[in-house]
């Protein structure tokens, strides 16, 4: 189960935290009376703790992203990752050569800017899901194309399947979230 919210990006960090807490409370109403704090792992992945005890809140995961005036969060009962991007013109072929597998770069060369963001948002969402960050997982990263050479709907990460789903966002943006799912080989 998950909850995905998209807002106009608030200017202040305190407002972003308030929106996140409201999304968490809407997802898990029994936490509405619990004082919560956000902490981060050494790699930067955020998680919730009880403000009173300092213990990690189990069974609730979240990921946030913002770009081009939008701010989004996903709250889930399992590990998840989210990336939201305003699709701005960029030197995407050079970025693809630097950060992507050769086959991903070839796909991007054919698919253009849209293709670049299809791979980039999956890569960022997966990096947030793993908690390792974009550069932290570089040696372990899977190719994000399927057998037909299109952006993957799911990839194998360690002993799990991670599924990618695009989120409906305004034109000119692309958002992808990922989560674990039971799948047969």
Where are these regions (language model features)?
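Core catalytic alpha/beta fold that binds nucleotide/phospho-ligands
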Residues: 1-185
């Amino acid at each position: 189960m998950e909850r995905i919210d998209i807002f106009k990006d608030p200017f202040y960090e305190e407002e972003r935290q308030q929106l996140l807490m409201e999304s968490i409370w809407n997802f898990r109403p029994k936490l509405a009376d619990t004082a919560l704090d956000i902490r981060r792992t050494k790699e930067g992945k955020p998680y919730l703790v009880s403000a009173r005890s300092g213990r990690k809140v189990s069974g609730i995961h979240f990921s946030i992203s913002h770009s081009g005036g939008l701010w989004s969060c996903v709250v889930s009962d399992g590990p998840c990752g989210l990336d939201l991007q305003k699709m701005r013109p960029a030197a995407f072929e050079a970025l693809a050569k630097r950060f992507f597998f050769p086959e991903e770069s070839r796909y991007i060369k054919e698919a253009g800017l849209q293709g670049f963001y299809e791979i980039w948002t999956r890569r960022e969402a997966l990096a947030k899901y793993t908690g390792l960050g974009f550069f932290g997982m570089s040696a372990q990263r899977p190719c994000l194309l399927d057998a037909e050479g299109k952006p993957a709907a799911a990839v194998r990460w360690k002993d799990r399947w991670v599924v990618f789903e695009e989120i409906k966002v305004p034109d000119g943006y692309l958002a992808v979230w990922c989560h674990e799912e039971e799948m047969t080989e």
